Curated annotation (Swiss-Prot):
Source species taxonomy: Bacteria, Pseudomonadati, Pseudomonadota, Gammaproteobacteria, Pseudomonadales
Reaction(s) the record says it catalyses: L-glutamate + acetyl-CoA = N-acetyl-L-glutamate + CoA + H(+)
Gene field: argA
Pathway assigned in UniProt: Amino-acid biosynthesis; L-arginine biosynthesis; N(2)-acetyl-L-ornithine from L-glutamate: step 1/4
The name this protein goes by in its record: Amino-acid acetyltransferase
Domain spans labelled N-acetyltransferase: 286-425
Top-rank lineage group of the source organism: Bacteria
GO cellular component terms given for this protein: cytoplasm
One of the GO BP terms on file: L-arginine biosynthetic process
Primary residence: cytoplasm
Entry keyword set: Acyltransferase, Amino-acid biosynthesis, Arginine biosynthesis, Cytoplasm, Transferase
C-alpha cells in the first residue's frame, strides 16, 4: 500500500476537525524570504481547500532593515521595539507594501504544473487593524511605532465567509488618519483573540521551543511559559512563546510554534497526532483518566497485538464492556495510547494490577509509571493493602518499581484458584 494512502487515512479525523475552523497564521519577514516560502504557500492553499478559514499575518523586519540600509539610515530600538521616526516610517510603508504585493502574487498562482492549479483564491486585505501610538516610555519617544487597538472582527469574518484568505500586514491606522508600524506578533495575537480563532500558528526559524539541551518541547500549558521566558531572555523564541501563551489566555483554543525552514512542518503539526512543533494549550493534550464504555474500541486496538504475542491474556469485547470500570487509560488527542486495570480480589484486602499496556510509539515516556501510580492510588482508596501482578515478560520493570517476587501460595484463594499453570506467569506483590 502506498505510504500516502495510510497518511490520508490517519489524517482524515483532523481534516474533519479543522473544517470551518478559523486559523490565524503568522509568518515573519524572514520566513517570506526563506527558500521554503513557496512550499508554505502551497500548504496554506491546501488548508483553504479543506475548508479552513485562514487569516495570514506577515512580518517585514528584514525587508525594513534592507531599505534603511539602502538609504543610509541607522535603525534604532528600545526594549526590542523599533523606534519609527518619519524617515523610518517611509521605509516601513515601502517594505510592507512591496511584501504584501509579493505574497498576494504567490497566492494568485494558478499554473498547470503548480499544486495551486485550480485554486482560484481570493486574497483580501485593507484597513482591518486599528492602532494607537505607543507614545513615550521611559523618556523614549517611539514616534510612529504603535500597538493594536482592535481588529475589524465583523469585516474579517465577512471576508472569511466569502471564502477569502485575509492578509494582514504589520501596519495599523488610527481614527485620525495616522499610520503606525506594528509588530506582526502583536497583530496575529490580537487578531486570533478578537476573532475567537480556533488556532494561532506562529512560524519561527526553529522547529518550536527548544529546551536548554536543544531538545524540542512538544507541549506546554500557559502557566508553564514564564519559566521558559526567563530562561530564553529576550530572543525571538521568547517572543513567539509569549504570543502563544497570551493567545491561549485570551481564549484561543491552541497555539502552535512551527518552523518556516522545514518543508511540511505546518501540515505535520496539524494532521498528525504528535505534530512537529510546540503546542501551547489550556486543555490537556494528553491525560490519564478512568475508562468509559466509549473506550472499548480503542482498548481493543491497543491490547489486541499484545494478546496475539501472548503478552496479555485475551479479553473479548464483551469482557471489556463488562469490566470497563476497572480500567484507567491514557488518552492522547482522542486516541487510547495506554491502559491498566485494577481488580479487587474477593474476600481479601488485596487487588490485582492487570492489562498494563502502552502503545509501542509512546513507550519512551513515563506513561506506564503514571498508570501504575493511578492504580495504586485507586487501590489505597478502596482500602486495599497489597497489590499483585502476574506477568510473563515484564518482571524487571515491576521489580524496579517496588514489586517483590511472590508465589501462588501468597495469592488470596479466590485468585489462586484461577491461576493458569500452563501460562506460568511470574507473580509479584507490593505492599501499599
Amino acid at each position: 500500500m502506498p505510504e500516502y494512502v495510510n497518511w490520508l487515512r490517519h489524517a482524515s479525523p483532523y481534516i474533519n476537525a479543522h473544517r470551518d475552523c478559523t486559523f490565524v497564521v503568522m509568518l515573519p519577514g524572514d520566513g517570506v524570504e526563506h527558500p521554503n516560502f513557496g512550499n508554505i504557500v502551497h500548504d496554506l492553499v491546501l488548508l483553504h481547500s479543506l475548508g479552513v478559514r485562514l487569516v495570514l499575518v506577515h512580518g517585514s523586519r528584514p525587508q525594513i532593515e534592507a531599505r534603511l540600509a539602502a538609504r543610509g539610515l541607522t535603525p534604532h530600538y528600545h526594549h526590542g521595539l523599533r523606534i519609527t521616526d518619519a524617515a523610518t516610517l517611509e521605509c516601513v510603508i515601502d517594505a510592507v507594501g512591496q511584501l504584501r504585493i509579493a505574497i498576494e502574487a504567490r497566492l494568485s498562482m494558478d499554473m498547470a504544473s503548480s499544486p495551486m492549479q485550480g485554486s482560484r483564491l481570493r486574497v483580501a486585505s485593507g484597513n482591518l487593524v486599528t492602532a494607537r501610538p505607543i507614545g513615550v516610555l521611559e523618556g523614549v519617544d517611539y514616534h510612529h511605532t504603535g500597538e493594536v487597538r482592535r481588529v475589524d472582527r465583523k469585516g474579517i469574518n465577512r471576508l472569511l465567509d466569502e471564502r477569502s484568505i485575509v492578509l494582514l500586514s504589520p501596519l495599523g491606522y488610527s481614527p485620525t488618519g495616522e499610520t503606525f508600524n506594528l509588530a506582526c506578533e502583536d497583530v496575529a495575537t490580537r487578531a486570533a483573540i478578537d476573532l475567537g480563532a480556533d488556532k494561532l500558528l506562529l512560524f519561527g526559524a526553529d522547529p518550536g521551543l527548544l529546551d536548554e539541551n536543544g531538545k524540542l518541547v512538544r507541549e506546554l500549558r500557559p502557566q508553564q511559559v514564564p519559566a521558559h521566558l526567563q530562561r530564553l531572555g529576550g530572543n525571538y523564541q521568547a517572543e513567539l512563546l509569549d504570543a502563544a501563551a497570551e493567545a491561549c489566555r485570551g481564549g484561543v483554543g491552541r497555539s502552535h510554534i512551527v518552523s518556516y525552514a522545514e518543508d511540511g512542518a505546518l501540515l505535520t503539526e496539524l494532521f498528525t497526532r504528535d505534530g512537529g512543533g510546540t503546542l501551547v494549550a489550556q486543555e490537556q493534550f494528553e491525560r490519564v483518566r478512568e475508562a468509559a464504555i466509549e473506550d472499548v474500541g480503542g482498548l481493543l486496538e491497543l491490547i489486541s497485538p499484545l494478546e496475539e504475542q501472548g503478552i496479555l491474556v485475551r479479553r473479548s469485547r464483551e469482557v471489556l464492556e463488562r469490566e470497563i470500570e476497572q480500567f484507567s487509560v491514557v488518552e492522547r488527542e482522542g486516541m487510547i495510547i495506554a491502559c491498566a486495570a485494577l481488580y479487587q480480589i474477593a474476600d481479601s484486602d488485596a487487588g490485582e494490577l492487570a492489562c498494563l499496556a502502552v502503545n509501542p510509539e509512546y513507550r519512551h515516556g513515563k506513561r506506564g509509571d503514571e498508570l501504575l501510580e493511578r492504580i495504586e492510588t485507586r487501590a489505597r482508596a478502596q482500602g486495599l493493602k497489597t497489590l499483585f501482578v502476574l506477568t510473563t515478560r515484564t518482571a524487571h520493570w515491576f521489580r524496579e518499581r517496588g514489586f517483590v517476587p511472590s508465589s501462588v501460595e501468597r495469592l488470596p484463594s479466590a485468585r489462586a484458584s484461577l491461576y493458569n499453570y500452563q501460562r506460568n506467569s511470574k507473580i509479584f506483590e507490593k505492599a501499599l
